[in-house]
Amino acid sequence: MSPMLQIAAEEMENPLIPPIPELVIGLIAFVIVFGFLAKKLLPNINKVLEERREAIEGGIEKAEAAQTEAQSVLEQYKAQLAEARHEAARLRQEAQEQGATLIAEMRAEGQRQREEIIAAGHAQIQADRKAAASALRQDVGKLATELAGKLVGESLEDHARQSRVIDRFLDELDDKATTAEATR
């Protein structure tokens, strides 16, 4: 064979197209493998894929439920916090009002006690003044009687008369003192 014929013969066989018997055997093998995969492996793969899809969807649903629950808990927390703040403000207001009331009561009580102490002091001063005036009258009367007795040179022992004279004299002095104070 000449080299030209050989090239022509080689050109007749296309290396890209397989021979027919190999093509038939390959096709039969492919159908068998595909059938086996479709019967045995494909359902398992589909089952796993379905489970994954359900798990993902379930996870999403769980996440959405958890997010909804978290949002609900957050809203409850915010409501409780607002209520606690309101309650704290109310308690603070009550404490301020009670404090103001207590201060007013204590001031009134202090004022009342002060008035009582002042009144008791005035009463005590008045009583002490009367006692001092009485003691002074007696002492002045006694001294006046002794002085008069020394001046006259005799004893003035008539006590009733002596008391009347001294009381009248001291009353006149009191009246003059009262009149002098009133004119000021």
From Swiss-Prot:
**Membrane disposition:** Single-pass membrane protein
Where does it live in the cell?
Cell membrane
- UniProt GO molecular function: proton-transporting ATP synthase activity, rotational mechanism
What coarse category fits the chief subcellular location reported for this protein? membrane
Per the record, its GO cellular-component terms are: plasma membrane; proton-transporting ATP synthase complex
Q: Which UniProt keywords apply?
A: ATP synthesis, Cell membrane, CF(0), Hydrogen ion transport, Ion transport, Membrane, Transmembrane, Transmembrane helix, Transport
Give the transmembrane region(s): 16-36
Where on the tree of life does the source sit, at the highest rank? Bacteria
Which protein family is it in? Answer: Belongs to the ATPase B chain family.
The record's annotation in NCBIfam families points to: ATP_synt_b, PRK05759.1-3
Task: State the function annotated in the UniProt record.
Answer: F(1)F(0) ATP synthase produces ATP from ADP in the presence of a proton or sodium gradient. F-type ATPases consist of two structural domains, F(1) containing the extramembraneous catalytic core and F(0) containing the membrane proton channel, linked together by a central stalk and a peripheral stalk. During catalysis, ATP synthesis in the catalytic domain of F(1) is coupled via a rotary mechanism of the central stalk subunits to proton translocation.
Q: What do we know about how this protein assembles, alone or with others? A: F-type ATPases have 2 components, F(1) - the catalytic core - and F(0) - the membrane proton channel. F(1) has five subunits: alpha(3), beta(3), gamma(1), delta(1), epsilon(1). F(0) has three main subunits: a(1), b(2) and c(10-14). The alpha and beta chains form an alternating ring which encloses part of the gamma chain. F(1) is attached to F(0) by a central stalk formed by the gamma and epsilon chains, while a peripheral stalk is formed by the delta and b chains.
Protein name in the entry: ATP synthase subunit b
To which species is this protein native?
Streptomyces coelicolor (strain ATCC BAA-471 / A3(2) / M145)
Name the encoding gene, please. Answer: atpF
